[in-house]
C-alpha cells in the first residue's frame, strides 16, 4: 500500500503526490527554545551530536513541534573525520577547528579508511531509533559533507572567508589535493551506505563551499568527487534518493544536474522557475525560500511559499529553505512555514 511509504520518500522517488513534502535544513537547532535549554545543559556540540540519546532527542524536537515530512539526523558533516584520523572541535560562535590541518602528502598517507560502524556507531543507532519513532509519518534523512567541503575544512583548519589555503593547494599541488579528495569520496560513500543501512530513507550531500569555485574549477575539484560518491552509493543502494546542496550554486547549477544526483537543492539566489528551466526534467528540485524571510510576517511567508510551489509545478519537488534556518528565527514563523507548506493546495486555490 503506497500510503505506508512516507510522503517525502514518494515525492523524492518521483511518484505523484497530493502536495509537496516540506522540511527545513537545520530544522533542529538554535532557533528552538527546547534546543537552547538542552545546549545550556550540554554545552559541547560534539557531545550533543555524538551522544545517541542527545542526538536522537534533538532530531525529534522539530518533529514533535511541527510534524515536518522529513526528520533529519542531528549531526555534523565533520562527524566522520576522527574515524579517518582527523581530530576536530566545534567552538560555539567560532565554528569548526581542525586540530592538525592537512597540508602535506605524509599526512594524507596516514589517513585511515572510514569504518562507520566502528568510529561512529552512534549515527547508526540514532537513525534506527528515528525510523522506529516516526514510522511512516515522516521520512528519515541522513546527510554527509561532500569531499571538496570536507577538504576545505581540513586544509584550512577552520572556516574561511576566501579559501586561500586550499586554493593554493589546488593550483600549486593539485595532485596532492586530488589524493585527499579521492580518499574522502571513498570514505563518504561508505558512510552514506552505512546511514542508509541504518535507516536513512533519503540522503543529502552538502557541498557547502563548492560555490566558492569557478565553474572550471568546480568541474575539476568538486563535481568528479560528488559524482564518485553518488556512483558508489547508487551501485549498492540504487533506490535511495540522493539530494545535492551547494550554497551559492547559481554559477554551477547545470553542472550539479549532471552529477547523477536525483534532486538538486536550490539556494534562494536562484528564482525557482529559472532553476527548474536550467535543470533536466528528470532531476528533482528542493528549496528554496530565503531563510531570512522567516523574520517577516506570516502573510509574506505564505505568499512566498505559494510563489515557490507554483513555479515548481510539474516537477519532482520538495519544499525547503534555500539554506539552513537562521538562529533567532521566531519559532512561530517556523510553524507558519510548515503549516503553509502542508496546506499549500488550499492556499493556492484561494488566490
UniProtKB/Swiss-Prot annotation:
Catalysis performed (reactions): uroporphyrinogen III + 4 H(+) = coproporphyrinogen III + 4 CO2
Give the gene name: hemE
Q: Which UniProt keywords apply?
A: Cytoplasm, Decarboxylase, Lyase, Porphyrin biosynthesis
Where is this protein localized, as stated in its record?
A: Cytoplasm
Free-text function comment from the UniProt entry? Catalyzes the decarboxylation of four acetate groups of uroporphyrinogen-III to yield coproporphyrinogen-III.
- Please report the organism this UniProt entry assigns to the protein: Prochlorococcus marinus (strain MIT 9211)
EC number(s) for this protein?
A: 4.1.1.37
Cytoplasm as UniProt keyword? yes
Q: What is this protein called?
A: Uroporphyrinogen decarboxylase
State any single GO MF term.
uroporphyrinogen decarboxylase activity
Amino acid at each position: 500500500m503506497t500510503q505506508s511509504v512516507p510522503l517525502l520518500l514518494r515525492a523524492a522517488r518521483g511518484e505523484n503526490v497530493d502536495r509537496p513534502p516540506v522540511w527545513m535544513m537545520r530544522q533542529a537547532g538554535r532557533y528552538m527554545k527546547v534546543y537552547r535549554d538542552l545546549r545550556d545543559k550540554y554545552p559541547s556540540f560534539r557531545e550533543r551530536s555524538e551522544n545517541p540519546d542527545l542526538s536522537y532527542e534533538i532530531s525529534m524536537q522539530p518533529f514533535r513541534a511541527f510534524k515536518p515530512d522529513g526528520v533529519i539526523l542531528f549531526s555534523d558533516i565533520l562527524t566522520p573525520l576522527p574515524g579517518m584520523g582527523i581530530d576536530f572541535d566545534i567552538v560555539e560562535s567560532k565554528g569548526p577547528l581542525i586540530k592538525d590541518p592537512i597540508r602535506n602528502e605524509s599526512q594524507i598517507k596516514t589517513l585511515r579508511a572510514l569504518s562507520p560502524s566502528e568510529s561512529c556507531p552512534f549515527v547508526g543507532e540514532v537513525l534506527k531509533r528515528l525510523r522506529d519513532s516516526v514510522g511512516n509519518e515522516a521520512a528519515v534523512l541522513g546527510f554527509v559533507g561532500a569531499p571538496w567541503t570536507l577538504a576545505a575544512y581540513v586544509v584550512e583548519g577552520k572556516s574561511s572567508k576566501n579559501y586561500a589555503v586550499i586554493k593554493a593547494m589546488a593550483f600549486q599541488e593539485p595532485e596532492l589535493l586530488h589524493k585527499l579528495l579521492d580518499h574522502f569520496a571513498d570514505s563518504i560513500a561508505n558512510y552514506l551506505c552505512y546511514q542508509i543501512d541504518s535507516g536513512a530513507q533519503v540522503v543529502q550531500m552538502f557541498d557547502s563551499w563548492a560555490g566558492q569555485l569557478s565553474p572550471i574549477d568546480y568541474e575539476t575539484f568538486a563535481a568528479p568527487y560528488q559524482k564518485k560518491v553518488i556512483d558508489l552509493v547508487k551501485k549498492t543502494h540504487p533506490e535511495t534518493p540522493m539530494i545535492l546542496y551547494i550554497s551559492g550554486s547559481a554559477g554551477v547549477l547545470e553542472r550539479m544536474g549532471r552529477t547523477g544526483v536525483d534532486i538538486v537543492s536550490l539556494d534562494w539566489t536562484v528564482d525557482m522557475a529559472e532553476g527548474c528551466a536550467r535543470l533536466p526534467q528528470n532531476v528533482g528540485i528542493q528549496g528554496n525560500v530565503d531563510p531570512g524571510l522567516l523574520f517577516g510576517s506570516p502573510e509574506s511567508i505564505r505568499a512566498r511559499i505559494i510563489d515557490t510551489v507554483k513555479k515548481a509545478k510539474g516537477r519532482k519537488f520538495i519544499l525547503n529553505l534555500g539554506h539552513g534556518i537562521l538562529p533567532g528565527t521566531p519559532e512561530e514563523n517556523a510553524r507558519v512555514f510548515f503549516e503553509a507548506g502542508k496546506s499549500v493546495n488550499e492556499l493556492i486555490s484561494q488566490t
